[in-house]
Amino acid sequence: MALVPGRSKEDGLWTRNSPGSSQHPESPRLPNPLWDRGKIGKVEGHQHIQVSTSSACVWQLAYPPVWPNLPAVPIQDFSQKSHLPSIVVESSEVNEESGDLHLPHEELLLLTDGEEEDAEAFFQDQSEEPGWAWSPQDPRSPLRTFNAGLSWGQDQDEEDACWILEDTACLEATNHCPFWDSTGSRVCRSGFVEYSHLLPPNSFEGAEEEAVQTPAGVESGAASEAPGGRGCDRPRADHAAPPQEAGVQCTCQHYTVREEAQKTPPADPACPEREDSHGSGSPFKASQD
């Protein structure tokens, strides 16, 4: 801030024609704006004037003793700048020949609150289209990327084959093994785990029926030979599993049942029908019993 100090009373009155007066033509002091507002005086190295450029707006105040009752008035406004917010983008490359600056490849995008919400809603709607998935790691697009496994010409069934549905859906199983009959078999798919219940092969249908009928014959024989409630400790036929479940279980234990049938079980006086059911006992013993 620059100030123009006035003279003290000891120096005498400050008249207009005195050499120290601001209205004197040879005076180095600044003119008073109350007399001449159109002129802008020049300051040329006066010892009582100090100029400071620390602030953006510089004022000069004068306290002349001629008007002791007047308040301090501004003389001159050197600069008054309005600071606007700006965005500075540093250049990545400089062409030495032409001197052109190459800006970075990243685009600078400024969105207001309303535009940001609209853009977010737009990308969410686009992500629900078939063939699009969220992928923030894709350098081409920060929000979505196209699934290369799908094409726009494919049907909905082919799309379901690539994407696992959230709801549990039963689909027909493919024939993975040539000797297995996949007709009537179903595969229940839930999430990423497949649960398959396949029917036994056609070549083992006769052996399966024999294995299923064997426990029923044993139970009937045990019921006839033990009227008093004594007999083999085996589960009853009415409490057995359904035919389909029994068939699935016998498929897993098919070879085990055949191996047990080939072996000769020990003689059990309480269950003589075991030898007849498996066919491993001698006919003479069976007739005596």
From Swiss-Prot:
Residues 1-36, 205-289 are annotated as: Disordered. Expressed in bladder cancer tissues (at protein level). One of its GO terms (biological process) is positive regulation of DNA-templated transcription. Pfam families: Lbh. Residues 1-128 form the LBH domain. It comes from the Eukaryota. Residues 15-25 have a biased composition (Polar residues). InterPro entries: LBH_dom, LBH_dom_prot. GO terms for cellular component: nucleus. PANTHER family: LBH DOMAIN-CONTAINING PROTEIN 1, PROTEIN LBH-RELATED. This is LBH domain-containing protein 1. The lineage of its organism: Eukaryota, Metazoa, Chordata, Craniata, Vertebrata.
